[in-house]
């Protein structure tokens, strides 16, 4: 007997849960941070590839002069991903120690983690503006 239905349910029929969403974004932020570390190492190695530093300075001048808004946005997004990944990592460490394992506490710790990540990212962005002198003391 042949039944016209899938063997296993597809992901689209499930309602997204807070815990699964946080898990997916934790993996995405980890992959993004690993990519940013790789590209930053490659960026700093560009100066070693040329015989003179003229091309490196020319490239760096292009980035800072023409793509300043892009670099600032990328740094802020990377800081947001780092704060989220770090806060969720602390949450996972607390789970490993046996804390917050009840379902209601899992959701509560997820919301607290999200607010901590947003607060840390906001503090980093404010500190970045202060160090550039855009906000007077």
Curated annotation (Swiss-Prot):
Pfam families: Sdh_cyt. InterPro entries: SQR/QFR_C/D, Succ_DH_cyt_bsu_CS, Succ_DH_cytb556, SuccDH_FuR_B_TM-su. Its cofactor is heme. The gene is SDH3. Keywords: Electron transport, Heme, Iron, Membrane, Metal-binding, Mitochondrion, Mitochondrion inner membrane, Transmembrane, Transmembrane helix, Transport, Tricarboxylic acid cycle. It comes from Marchantia polymorpha. Heme binds at residue 85. One of its GO terms (molecular function) is metal ion binding. It is a multi-pass membrane protein. This is Succinate dehydrogenase cytochrome b560 subunit. Pathway: Carbohydrate metabolism; tricarboxylic acid cycle. The keyword Transmembrane helix applies. GO terms for cellular component: mitochondrial inner membrane. One of its GO terms (biological process) is tricarboxylic acid cycle. Forms part of complex II containing four subunits: a 70 kDa flavoprotein (FP), a 27 kDa iron-sulfur protein (IP), a cytochrome B and a membrane-anchoring protein. Membrane-anchoring subunit of succinate dehydrogenase (SDH) that is involved in complex II of the mitochondrial electron transport chain and is responsible for transferring electrons from succinate to ubiquinone (coenzyme Q). Belongs to the cytochrome b560 family. The heme is bound between the two transmembrane subunits. The chain crosses the membrane at residues 31-51, 60-80, 106-126. It is found in: Mitochondrion inner membrane. Coiled coil: none annotated. It comes from the Eukaryota.
């Amino acid at each position: 007997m042949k039944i016209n239905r899938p063997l296993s349910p597809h992901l689209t029929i499930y309602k997204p849960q807070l815990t699964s969403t946080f898990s997916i974004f934790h993996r995405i932020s980890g992959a993004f941070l690993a990519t940013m570390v790789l590209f930053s190492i490659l960026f700093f190695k560009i100066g070693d590839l040329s015989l003179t530093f003229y091309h490196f300075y020319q490239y760096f001048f292009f980035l800072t002069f023409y793509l300043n808004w892009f670099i600032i946005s990328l740094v802020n997004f990377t800081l947001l991903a780092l704060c989220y990944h770090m806060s969720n990592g602390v949450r996972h460490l607390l789970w490993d120690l046996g804390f917050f394992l009840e379902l209601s506490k899992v959701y509560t710790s997820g919301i607290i983690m999200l607010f901590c990540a947003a607060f840390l990212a906001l503090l980093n962005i404010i500190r970045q503006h202060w160090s550039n002198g855009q906000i007077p003391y």
